[in-house]
Amino acid sequence: MQLFHLCLIIFCSCPTVQASKLCLGWLWGMDIDPYKEFGASVELLSFLPSDFFPSVRDLLDTASALYRDALESPEHCTPNHTALRQAILCWGELMTLASWVGNNLEDPAARDLVVNYVNTNMGLKIRQLLWFHISCLTFGRDTVLEYLVSFGVWIRTPPAYRPPNAPILSTLPETTVVRQRGRAPRRRTPSPRRRRSQSPRRRRSQSPASQC
């Protein structure tokens, strides 16, 4: 397995220092968090279950459809664009390496181990990275961070004391902000009905004819 990581470092031609540090962190267990500079953390992302993240193919299609021009531009756009470029390049190199290893390994069991490791471990890391940066570009970084906190609070709350449905990122500002939960709309108390005057009615003066 260490040989596999070493091959990853050699073949992962990431263009920036941050991506290179990410690869080195996987090899030597360095405490490098790729989300730290964006206000998040690996631990915060870990609250989301693995099946929450779309497939790499779907995420790449989304990135291409929404941000292809910015990703291919030679100019610097945002740190999220840069990190997204790095993740896409690393995944491409990783697939090239996995194909090379698969084609050159004669042992089917060893080949399956490599493929499963890439898809299960490395694939999940890439899916998390792609989802995070695409979401930051789509919804805004503050909204994504607030969503991660809201989901973390929701998932750690016992089922009996939390809403049945998890927060949804696209509707976060309207419905899933933690501080807005539990507030019922204030009803206007009806004003008391105006009581009638208790003063006795004035008697109508009787005509002399009625007194006869």
Swiss-Prot record:
SUPFAM superfamilies tied to this protein: Hepatitis B viral capsid (hbcag) (SSF47852)
Region annotation (3 X 8 AA repeats of S-P-R-R-R-R-S-Q) ranges: 184-206
Region annotation Disordered: where it falls in the sequence: 165-212
Sequence repeats: 184-190, 191-198, 199-206
Signal sequence region: 1-19
Keywords of this entry: Disulfide bond, Host nucleus, Host-virus interaction, Repeat, Secreted, Signal, Viral immunoevasion
Biased composition (Basic residues): 180-205
UniProt GO BP: microtubule-dependent intracellular transport of viral material towards nucleus; symbiont entry into host cell; viral penetration into host nucleus
InterPro entries: Hepatitis_B_virus_capsid_N, Hepatitis_core, Viral_capsid_core_dom_sf_HBV
GO cellular component: extracellular region; host cell; host cell cytoplasm; host cell nucleus; T=4 icosahedral viral capsid
GO molecular function annotations of the record: DNA binding; RNA binding; structural molecule activity
UniProt KW Secreted keyword: yes
Residues that make up the propeptide removed upon maturation: 184-212
PTM notes: Phosphorylated.
The organism's place on the tree of life at top rank: Viruses
Gene3D superfamilies: Viral capsid, core domain supefamily, Hepatitis B virus
Localization (cell): Secreted; Host nucleus
Function noted in UniProt: May regulate immune response to the intracellular capsid in acting as a T-cell tolerogen, by having an immunoregulatory effect which prevents destruction of infected cells by cytotoxic T-cells. This immune regulation may predispose to chronicity during perinatal infections and prevent severe liver injury during adult infections.
Similarity remark: Belongs to the orthohepadnavirus precore antigen family.
Subunit annotation: Homodimerizes.
Protein name, entry field: External core antigen
Source organism of the structure: Hepatitis B virus genotype H subtype adw4 (isolate Nicaragua/2928Nic/1997)
Phylogenetic classification of the source organism: Viruses, Riboviria, Pararnavirae, Artverviricota, Revtraviricetes
Designated gene of the protein: C
